[in-house]
Regions:
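Conserved nucleotide-sugar phosphate-binding/catalytic loop shared by glycosyltransferases and other
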Residues: 35-46, 65-117, 191, 347-349
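C-terminal alpha-helical cap of glycosyltransferases
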Residues: 3, 28, 382-402
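Donor-nucleotide binding loops and adjacent catalytic segments primarily
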Residues: 33, 76, 81-83, 207-213, ...
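Conserved donor-binding/catalytic loop of nucleotide-activated donor transferases
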Residues: 149, 294-296, 310-321, 340
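Acidic donor-binding loop of glycosyltransferase active sites
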Residues: 128-130, 294-307, 316
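Active-site-proximal region of nucleotide-activated glycan assembly enzymes
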Residues: 147-209
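Glycosyltransferases and closely related glycan-assembly transferases
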Residues: 118-131, 139-154, 167-171
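A short, well-ordered alpha-helix in the C-terminal region of glycosyltransferases
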Residues: 369-383
Length: 402
């Protein structure tokens, strides 16, 4: 994001790395030949798969002949999304690294060896010249298999706080790209988050009329987007369902993406609001998030890394509600935007119908404040991260051919 959007190292692996001089100097792009074959390892969640596919598209644009193979599992989103995008997918067993002593921990060595062997076979079959890992279950086996074969490794970390797989990967390579400044990985360089083309190229103002018409909204009314991602967010759904009548009566129209199977009929009447109030449109899933962003003046959402970066790239004011689980990475993902007064952040437990009425409704009706937030957000956004990460891949490939 900052320039200038379904794992076993020691704890010291996320400490700051060696002095900058240990990192190879970037090669001039004219001297950095792109790889002929790349294996992209990552999957499980959209947070890993989306940047993987964005990089794949960028590499293919640069060289239509490059061979690209994604490495994932049969159970992750990649099993559907990668083939749909036209790329080959090789699968390996899913290996979960237990955080506490358990029977699963006793089985880990054998399971990890099987996954590394399967990853190695995929690298050999692809003739991989570079392996790019995005974290998640498949990245650790891919990193270990690549290291054993002396194949250059590139790591991309999406979150402000790195996961275990990428802590391991960063110990094995100097080619480490991060989304956020300050991510504690060795050799880290900020490249941003590779975004899907329809988001990276979005002109919200130019698409606003089309987008609002697509959702059945009024052309000029204040517009709020509420989304908890593809799985939805029960806290957001409950709070906004309870305040739907107030939003509609105040003239604030809403696109509410609830998650599959979590739709509701707002109190205003039909799914698009009552005749007298502003529309309240409830949908389970938005397959055109570019249009949802273009239609909105404000979004209330979780602060996953991909979402934070998409919102910043398109300059959309946001109220972030970090998911209150994991290692707290969602709070850290939004930290830079919060510090710049480009967005608001609220704890999950505070999100209630009363909070929507007292905080979100006045903000949605304050165009001057939203304009200031939009400007601050856009100033921190980055749209060229796919190219920056592809440059890092080219560097690694050139180093491997020296």
């Amino acid at each position: 994001m900052t320039p200038a959007t379904p794992d076993v190292p020691p704890a010291t692996a996320d400490a700051p790395g060696p002095a900058p001089e240990s990192v190879p100097e970037p090669l001039p792009l004219s001297a950095a030949r792109g790889p002929r074959s790349v294996v992209l390892a990552g999957g499980g969640s959209a947070g890993h798969v989306s940047p993987l596919l964005a990089l794949a598209d960028c590499l293919r644009r640069r060289d239509p002949q490059v061979r690209i193979v994604a490495l994932g599992t049969q159970a992750g989103l990649e099993a559907r999304l990668v083939p749909e995008r036209g790329y080959a997918l090789a699968t390996i067993p899913k290996v979960v690294f237990p955080r506490k002593p358990s029977a699963a921990a006793l089985r880990l060595p054998g399971a990890l060896k099987a996954a590394v062997d399967a990853a190695g076979a995929a690298l050999d079959e692809a003739g991989a010249e570079v392996v790019v890992g995005f974290g998640g279950y498949v990245s650790s086996p891919a990193y270990l298999a690549a290291r054993a074969r002396r194949i250059p490794i590139v790591v991309h970390e999406q979150n402000a706080r790195p996961g275990l797989a990428n802590r391991l990967g960063a110990r094995l390579t100097p080619y480490v790209g991060t989304t956020f400044a300050g991510t504690a990985l060795r050799h880290a360089r900020v490249v941003g988050m590779p975004l899907r083309p329809e988001i990276a190229t979005l002109d919200r103002a130019a698409r606003r009329a089309e987008a609002r018409a697509a959702f059945g909204l009024r052309p000029e009314s204040p517009t709020l987007l509420v989304t908890g991602g593809s799985l939805g967010a029960a806290r957001l759904n409950g709070a906004f369902a309870g305040a739907a009548a107030d939003l509609s009566a105040a003239g604030v129209q809403v696109i509410h993406v609830t998650g599959l199977g979590k739709e509701f009929v707002p109190e205003t009447g039909s799914g698009s609001g009552s005749a007298g109030g502003a529309p309240y449109v409830v949908i389970p899933y938005a397959d055109r998030m570019d249009l949802a962003y273009a239609a909105a003046d404000l979004v209330v959402c979780r602060s996953g890394a991909n979402t934070v970066c998409e919102v910043a790239a398109v300059g959309l004011p946001a109220v972030f509600v970090p998911l209150p689980i994991g290692n707290g990475e969602q709070r850290f993902n939004a930290a830079e935007l919060v510090a710049a007064d480009a967005c608001l952040l609220v704890e999950d437990a505070r999100v209630t119908p009363d909070w929507v009425r007292e905080t979100v409704l006045p903000l949605a009706g304050d165009p001057a404040r939203l304009a200031r937030m939009a400007s601050a957000t856009a100033a921190l956004g980055r749209r060229d991260a796919d190219e920056a990460l592809a440059d890092l891949v080219a560097e690694a490939a050139a180093e491997g051919h020296r």
